[in-house]
Amino acid sequence: MKLLRYGPSGQEKPGILDADGRIRDLSAHVPDLSGDVLSDAGLARLRAIDPATLPLVSGEPRIGACVGHVGKFIGIGLNYADHAAEAGMPVPKEPVVFGKWTSSICGPNDGIDIPKGSVKTDWEVELGVVIGATCKDVDEARALDYVAGYCVVNDVSEREWQIERGGQWDKGKGFDTFGPIGPWLVTRDEVPDPQRLDLWLEIDGHRYQNGNTRTMVFTVAQLIAYLSSCMTLQPGDVITTGTPPGVGMGIKPSPVFLKAGQMVRLGVEGLGEQLQHTRDAR
């Protein structure tokens, strides 16, 4: 299934794509795509519904983040060896974990706000993993059983705040609009191998990032097992699993960063695309 949330920010309704790619409304069956709705049992109930029997959503509504009420938005850094090299950092021996504030979450096509005074706002196309069941201390072999589905994430980052101003990375990762998620939550059964997905990103039509999740340092299963050893993962938590090379700060001889008035387009194989316009923060 391809699940989504549509409508004005803060008033999103749950939906599903039918066989023709049209949005059907699910709000008579579930209040949101969150919590127990994301469990195997909850998704099985949705799967039993014939989308053709659901109300058709007219027009072209805004698409919101594909998960509601996210509890934890967990980032993984330097998870592609070639990205670590372009960043001038060693390949990590353990996952680099940071937090993205849930207030950064927005829809896949919402605008990206360039923070006041920022000259180092950067892009990162990533595979997002949505947890569907509570897990603690899970084995790598069973880790994917706890996944509800997958989505596209743009881990927008302000490099000065992330790297140059001391402290943790979180500061540069959590500005408002720095967490576009979606358009769809593609359920686990439709993604047979999360380690075989192409991902890409373009700025104003120029392709900067081309990668595949097979080159991750730590696989999705390894990340879930690792994270569950130091925290309890809960339904609706989102893990964004790192980016391939081609980010702005790694461009030689001179880095390239986002500025207002640009168009960012990105996607992950089978999970849809995002399209964002950049603007100065108000």
Swiss-Prot record:
Cofactor(s) demanded: Mg(2+)
InterPro entries per the UniProt record, alphabetical: FAH, Fumarylacetoacetase-like_C, Fumarylacetoacetase_C_sf
Residues where Mg(2+) binds: 124, 126, 155
Highest classification ranks of the organism: Bacteria, Pseudomonadati, Pseudomonadota, Betaproteobacteria, Burkholderiales
Entry's Gene Ontology BP terms: urate catabolic process
Record-stated family: Belongs to the FAH family.
SUPFAM superfamilies: FAH
Molecular function in Gene Ontology: hydrolase activity; metal ion binding; ureidoglycolate lyase activity
EC number, UniProt record: 3.-.-.-
Keyword Metal-binding included in the entry's annotation: yes
UniProt protein name: Putative hydrolase Bcep18194_B0137
Pfam families xrefs: FAA_hydrolase
Protein keywords: Hydrolase, Magnesium, Metal-binding
Enzyme class: hydrolase
The keyword Magnesium is annotated on this UniProt entry: yes
